[in-house]
Curated annotation (Swiss-Prot):
It comes from Mus musculus (Mouse). Gene3D superfamilies: 3.40.50.10890, Ribonuclease Z/Hydroxyacylglutathione hydrolase-like (3.60.15.10). Component of the Integrator complex, composed of core subunits INTS1, INTS2, INTS3, INTS4, INTS5, INTS6, INTS7, INTS8, INTS9/RC74, INTS10, INTS11/CPSF3L, INTS12, INTS13, INTS14 and INTS15. The core complex associates with protein phosphatase 2A subunits PPP2CA and PPP2R1A, to form the Integrator-PP2A (INTAC) complex. INTS9 is part of the RNA endonuclease subcomplex, composed of INTS4, INTS9, INTS11 and inositol hexakisphosphate (InsP6). Interacts with WDR73; interaction is required for the assembly of the RNA endonuclease subcomplex in the cytoplasm. The keyword Plastid does not apply. A motif (Nuclear localization signal) lies at residues 566-570. PANTHER family: INTEGRATOR COMPLEX SUBUNIT 9 (PTHR46094:SF1). SMART domains: Beta-Casp. There is a cross-link at residue 58 (Glycyl lysine isopeptide (Lys-Gly) (interchain with G-Cter in SUMO2)). This is Integrator complex subunit 9. The gene is Ints9.
Length: 658
């Protein structure tokens, strides 16, 4: 069993597991932190960004200053943002049989995999994962395509040039794998390969293994996966949460008795309490709008935004914010808000029960009905007419490199009355803000990450007790910025096995058993013989038939009778010849009794010699030797087949036949 690690980002995993002749890809996350090296894509022409000075090497490379721009001491690539793809050279991705998706954040690289690697398999995901994943991809494509940029930068990627660039460009990894965004045509083609599954549904893969999705408690439709054969079990835990938010709670019991547990997608902010962050978010939001400022919340169109809107629903009246407009701008805003209300079966029990009252599971439906929350596809059209300040605005993208958020950063960034509140943990807020410096608006960092922290992981591992734990190397050591915090790493026995990007891990357990079925008529023919009190044995002579990784013992074909006809058989009528099977023998030969038997049958001049492994019986008159050992008996005589058969029959009297 081998694990191929194709991604270096622990919360955006992409691994390939080879198990029992099947090749299974576990997630295909897309590392978007690479976009932080690029200049933002403004919806409206930005004189500030257009007039940034070019950056070039000291040798005065004239072409480089067209690709690189400098802003407040940072250097950025002036080109369409590119994304860091999973490894495509470590393993032939056309050999991947299936892709298992754990949540909608971990499928953003799917079109790159399914459309450009020769992949012909099936993708398995829950319905909310597929539908919300579609929304995230559609939003991403829309953000990139609506701001066409003619310039494409590639000179800076040359290894000899890159090493001379300032950080973080100098330290950017795998820049040769960075690619532009896919198209909607590729998105639709990739999604057409998805087969929808439900929690606890068992899916057979080629008769070799069975895969089962379990609720992971993190997002709508998010899953952990069990991959098991009859005698081995692998658990894949990715993006899980024990907190009570809107999804179904995490299924922990099904993870027990795992031979290997692959652990990814832990919280990116292990020292931040999500509840505390939500409280800080609300208080900073209220403080800003009371002072006449606007609040900008960069976010994804699904996930944490549902919980934030629910908290604000309970908070706005008590905080005196009833008259403050809330705006949600995204090309998929309407679809996202509607989807959250119709996936009732994937919600926690409290929200499920509201559906039957009937009430909407999420309170943002009421916020929309009362006009406290308005949603728009973009800043153009209706939004321009309805827009009033001060306001609270939710929009994408959290990287601040594309989307409507770029426009509002340019619009509001010069006033200290305004505040930007970061709630998504995927991007460094300091790096996200770098191309907008100098910035007057206030910045609040309230990362809300409900995924498992290290304390919860330690408790989980003690409860489910896997034989082996496998995880990214980042989880086996404290974070670089907090090297003294030994509690911010996985602590388990035996120690976790770690992996890094482009590494192949041989997992430390070997298959020992295989399940074989036996045909009823063959079972009927077995005659067990008691060899010890309470222990019976029966020999099985059969044909092993294997198809689709299922093994069946069938009765052997009867020996074919020779026919005088010389007529040729058709190929498909050929049956393998079956020789008459010799019985298996067991037992031991008592030498003294055997010698007496030989004498009774006319043999004389018998001599017995002891050897290291047994005895040798010499028949001197017949010039024959019988070698008796613990696990074999040999009759050695000189070209006298009649004598050999007589002696064989006498030996067989002392042995049991099966």
């Amino acid at each position: 069993m081998k694990l191929y690690c194709l991604s270096g980002h622990p919360t955006l995993p992409c691994n390939v597991l080879k198990f029992k002749s099947t090749t299974i890809m576990l997630d295909c996350g897309l590392d978007m932190t690479s976009t932080l090296n690029f200049l933002p894509l403004p919806l409206v022409q930005s004189p500030r960004l257009s007039n940034l000075p070019g950056w070039s090497l000291k040798d005065g490379n004239a072409f480089l200053d067209k690709e690189l721009k400098e802003c407040s001491g940072h250097v950025f690539v002036d080109s369409v943002p590119e994304f860091c793809l999973p490894e495509t050279e470590l393993i032939d991705l056309s050999t991947v049989d299936v892709i298992l998706i754990s949540n909608y954040h971990c499928m953003m690289a799917l079109p790159y995999i399914t459309e450009h690697t020769g992949f012909t398999g099936t993708v398995y995901a829950t319905e909310p994962t597929m539908q919300i994943g579609r929304l995230l991809m559609e939003e991403l494509v829309n953000f990139i395509e609506r701001v066409p940029k003619a310039q494409s930068a590639s000179l800076w990627k040359n290894k000899d040039i890159q090493r001379l660039l300032p950080s973080p460009l100098k330290d950017a990894v795998e820049v040769s794998t960075w690619r532009r965004c896919y198209t909607m045509q590729e998105v639709n083609s990739a999604l057409s390969k998805i087969q929808l599954v439900g929690y606890s549904q068992k899916i057979e893969l080629f008769g070799a293994v069975q895969v089962t999705p379990l609720s992971s408690g993190y997002a709508l439709g998010s899953s952990n996966w069990i991959i098991q054969s009859h005698y081995e079990k692998v658990s894949y835990v990715s993006g899980s949460s024990l907190l009570t938010t809107h999804p179904q709670p995490m299924d922990q019991a099904s993870l027990k008795n795992s031979d290997v547990l692959i652990l990814t997608g832990l919280t990116q902010i292990p020292t931040a309490n999500p509840d505390g962050m939500v409280g800080e978010f609300c208080s900073n939001l209220a403080l800003t709008v009371r002072n006449g400022g606007n609040v900008l919340v960069p976010c994804y169109p699904s996930g944490v935004i549902y919980d934030l809107l629910e908290c604000l629903y309970q908070y706005i009246d008590s905080a005196g914010l009833s008259n403050i407009p809330f705006y949600f701008i995204s090309p998929v805003a309407n679809s996202s808000l509607e989807f959250s209300q119709i996936f009732a079966e994937w919600l926690c029990h409290n929200k499920q029960s509201k559906v039957y009252l009937p009430e909407p599971p999420f309170p943002h439906a009421e916020l929309i009905q009362t006009n406290k929350l308005k949603h728009y596809r973009s800043i153009h059209g209706d939004f321009s007419n309805d827009f009033r300040q001060p306001c609270v605005l939710f929009t994408g993208h959290p990287s601040l490199r594309f989307g409507d958020v770029v426009h509002f950063m340019e619009l509001w960034g010069k006033s200290s009355l305004n505040t930007i509140i970061f709630t998504e943990p995927d991007f460094s807020y300091l790096e996200a803000l770098a191309p907008y410096q100098p910035l007057a608006m206030k910045c609040i960092y309230c990362p809300i990450d409900t995924r498992l922290n290290f304390i919860q992981v330690s408790k989980l591992l003690k409860e489910v007790q896997p034989l082996h734990v496998v995880c990214p190397e980042q989880y086996t050591q404290p974070p670089p910025a907090q090297a003294h915090r030994m509690d911010l790493m996985i602590d388990c026995q035996p120690p976790a096995m770690s992996y890094r990007r482009a590494e192949v891990l041989a997992l430390p357990f070997k298959r020992r058993y295989e399940k074989i079925e036996i045909m009823p008529e063959l079972a009927d023919s077995l005659v067990p013989m008691e060899i010890k009190p309470g222990i019976s044995l029966a020999t099985v002579s059969a044909v092993l038939h294997t198809k689709d990784n299922k093994h069946v013992l069938q009765p052997p074909p009867k020996p074919t009778q020779p026919t005088s006809s010389k007529k040729r058989k058709r190929v498909n009528e050929d049956i393998p010849d079956c020789k008459v099977l010799k019985p298996l023998l067991s037992g031991s030969i008592p030498v003294e009794q055997f010698v007496q038997t030989l004498e009774k049958h006319g043999f004389s001049d018998i001599k017995v010699e002891d050897t290291a492994k047994g005895h040798i019986v010499l028949l001197q008159e017949a010039e024959t030797l019988i070698q008796i050992e613990e696990d074999s008996t040999h009759i050695i005589c000189d070209n006298d087949e009649t004598l050999r058969v007589r002696l064989r029959d006498l030996v067989l009297r002392f042995l049991q036949k099966f």
